[in-house]
């Protein structure tokens, strides 16, 4: 059976959405909800052979809940970096990016007691046409998993353009059929796909020379809306924007969450979980 890789972008959605919307710069994280979501992920992995996985964690979690990062590392998972805050790197100067990256890496290394060698940009947004951000990244980590593409050739071409070199672990993104919108192998896309569409994308990834690799988030493994912002928290946005964001959150916290574990289990009937990314750089990195 071929391998299917699973990685988690480990972030507190409620904290990060409020920051994106300008409601706060930072505030206490929902550590109990993060812990419950981690435990749901761990139960899923244990029920499917006990493979270990890679958790791309925001630095703020390591700052506020170092014991949770230590536990994830102690249970055998790879701790990788998902920036300090969940900010869009394409909106940051190289200097701001460098400062946030170093802050995140030092918090994650201290909390996990592990080397932290992998990185994924929040929302996969990191400038790919300008080299400054990747040059900085290559000084601090061994691999990046922020590149979306539909062929191994595209990933190799991008990887070859980087100096200093950095290993690229791409995420497959393509149209499941002609004229359909481009979809990624993970997140909301995976929740909304039918099982057949997900299986088709996994097959297409393999045919394109890319080891199938699904990314998911803690809030997708729970269906209790524990990462949703309340109407009261959204109220400072004004009635119209608050109502919009309150409704919009269903996309992340409600629609398809209950059926996700069964869908993943069904996909795993034809695959085995691939394990930590840092232990599989040879099949994955281009
Ligand atoms: Zn993220």
Positions of PLM-derived features:
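Catalytic alpha-helical scaffold of carbohydrate-active enzymes acting on polysaccharides/glycoconjugates
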Residues: 1-118, 123-177, 194-286
């Amino acid at each position: 059976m071929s391998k299917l890789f699973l990685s988690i972008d480990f972030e507190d959605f409620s904290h990060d959405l409020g920051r994106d919307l300008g409601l706060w710069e930072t505030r206490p994280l929902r550590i109990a909800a993060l812990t419950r979501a981690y435990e749901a992920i761990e139960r899923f992995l244990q029920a499917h052979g006990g493979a270990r996985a890679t958790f791309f964690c925001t630095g703020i979690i390591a700052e506020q809940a170092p014991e949770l990062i230590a536990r994830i590392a102690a249970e055998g998972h790879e701790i990788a970096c998902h920036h300090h805050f969940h900010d869009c790197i394409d909106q940051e100067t190289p200097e701001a990016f460098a400062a946030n990256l170093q802050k995140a890496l030092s918090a994650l290394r201290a909390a996990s007691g592990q080397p932290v060698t992998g990185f994924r940009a929040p929302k996969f947004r990191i400038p790919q046409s300008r080299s400054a951000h990747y040059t900085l990244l290559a000084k601090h980590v061994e691999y990046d998993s922020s590149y979306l593409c539909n062929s191994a050739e595209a990933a190799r071409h991008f990887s070859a353009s980087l100096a200093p070199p950095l290993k690229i672990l791409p995420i497959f993104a393509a149209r499941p059929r002609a004229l359909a919108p481009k979809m990624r192998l993970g997140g909301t896309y995976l929740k909304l796909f039918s099982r057949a569409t997900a299986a088709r994308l996994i097959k297409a990834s393999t045919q394109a020379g890319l080891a199938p690799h699904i990314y998911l988030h803690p809030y997708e493994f729970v269906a209790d809306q524990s990462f949703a912002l309340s109407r009261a928290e959204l109220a400072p946005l004004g009635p119209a924007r608050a109502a919009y964001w309150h409704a919009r959150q269903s996309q992340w916290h409600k629609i398809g969450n209950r059926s996700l574990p069964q869908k993943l289990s069904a996909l795993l009937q034809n695959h085995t979980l691939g394990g930590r990314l840092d232990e599989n750089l040879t099949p994955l990195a281009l």
